[in-house]
């Protein structure tokens, strides 16, 4: 069990009524809470959501707060400070004064910094410190008036092969305020990508998807991501750039296995973070299994840190892998099915 969940169980006597677990890990916590606790989960991680659904735990996959009413909320601290600001805002706009909010997180995950954000809304108290985690309690004294989701957007412009794109990114989305180096290295090669049905695996704020859609109005883009905030950001990026929704297929995925088949191309700056931890499972799975989702002569385009062994993985499954460039610590890799 996740150590943060263990800390919650140690202090379960504080819980009562309808309790919303926000950003909770997919473990046995809910099943081990007392039966009188009516617990449900709000998550934006599709893999976690599927896990909760499979175990019969009431779960809500969205960027928005659930529509039900709750007596308490437990926030598992996210990696992003901006995302925590958003979560705190929506919690304080849905709960009432004198209700309880709990904040739990790992010390190395910034729980003490998060507690300082929490104290903007009332008196806080540290309830526990164990398993390299802390649990804080807030009695709500100040509630918020809900702000529209669009007010949380960060936008910036990107020049790609003579086109200017406006990128929209919600809190917690990779490279929310600027173009990351890996994608910048990949962008000049996007005009070589085969047209047709194209998947952007780990679409983030939709930079790759948006360029490919704008470059050819006949392209159909399957924007794939595990994160609801990324999918919502991609949809907003398309709208901001005047690209019709008929070119966009948004799809939450747990990995490449959930992707459509018979694709003309898969393009990716693959994800490698899960919360505060590094996890290469999704990107390694992409290298190993992308061919199953491509048509004959379909293309795989990946940008990745040069120290990763992806060329070997791709060559093993495609029979070849071409390194298009090696620049600023990143390689652009190409293979044809």
From Swiss-Prot:
Record's keyword annotation contains Transmembrane helix: no
GO cellular component, one term: cytoplasm
Entry keyword set: Cytoplasm, Methyltransferase, rRNA processing, S-adenosyl-L-methionine, Transferase
Single GO molecular function: 16S rRNA (guanine(1207)-N(2))-methyltransferase activity
Catalytic activity: guanosine(1207) in 16S rRNA + S-adenosyl-L-methionine = N(2)-methylguanosine(1207) in 16S rRNA + S-adenosyl-L-homocysteine + H(+)
Family according to the record: Belongs to the methyltransferase superfamily. RsmC family.
HAMAP family: 16SrRNA_methyltr_C (MF_01862)
Protein name: Ribosomal RNA small subunit methyltransferase C
């Amino acid at each position: 069990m996740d150590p943060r969940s263990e800390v919650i169980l140690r202090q379960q006597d504080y819980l009562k009524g309808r309790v919303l677990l926000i950003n909770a890990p997919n473990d046995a916590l809910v099943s081990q809470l007392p039966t009188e606790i009516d617990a449900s989960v709000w998550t934006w991680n599709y893999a976690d959501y599927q896990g909760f659904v499979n175990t019969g735990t009431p779960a809500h996959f969205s960027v928005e707060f659930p529509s039900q009413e709750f007596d308490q909320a437990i926030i598992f601290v996210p990696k992003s400070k901006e995302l925590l600001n958003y979560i705190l805002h929506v919690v304080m706009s849905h709960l009432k004064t004198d209700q309880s909010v709990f904040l739990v997180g790992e010390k190395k995950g910034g729980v003490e910094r998060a507690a300082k954000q929490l104290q903007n809304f009332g008196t806080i108290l540290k309830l526990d410190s164990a398993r390299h985690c802390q649990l804080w309690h807030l009695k709500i004294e100040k509630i918020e008036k809900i702000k529209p989701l669009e007010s949380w957007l960060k936008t910036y412009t990107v020049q790609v092969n003579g086109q200017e794109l406006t990128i929209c990114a919600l809190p917690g989305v990779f490279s929310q305020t600027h173009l990351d180096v890996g994608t910048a290295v990949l962008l000049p090669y996007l005009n070589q990508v085969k047209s047709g049905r194209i998947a952007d695996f780990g679409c983030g704020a939709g930079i790759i998807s948006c360029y490919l859609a704008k470059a050819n109005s006949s392209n159909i883009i399957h924007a794939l991501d595990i994160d609801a905030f990324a999918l919502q950001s991609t949809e907003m990026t398309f709208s901001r750039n005047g690209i019709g929704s008929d070119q966009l297929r948004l799809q939450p995925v747990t990995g490449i296995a959930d992707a459509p088949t018979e694709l003309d191309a898969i393009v990716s700056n693959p994800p490698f973070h899960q919360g505060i931890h590094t996890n290469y499972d999704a990107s390694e799975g992409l290298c190993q299994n992308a061919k199953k989702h491509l048509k004959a002569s379909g293309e795989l385009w990946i940008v990745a840190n040069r120290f990763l062994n992806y060329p070997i993985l791709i060559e093993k499954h495609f029979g070849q892998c071409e390194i298009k460039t090696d620049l600023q610590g990143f390689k652009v890799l190409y293979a044809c099915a």
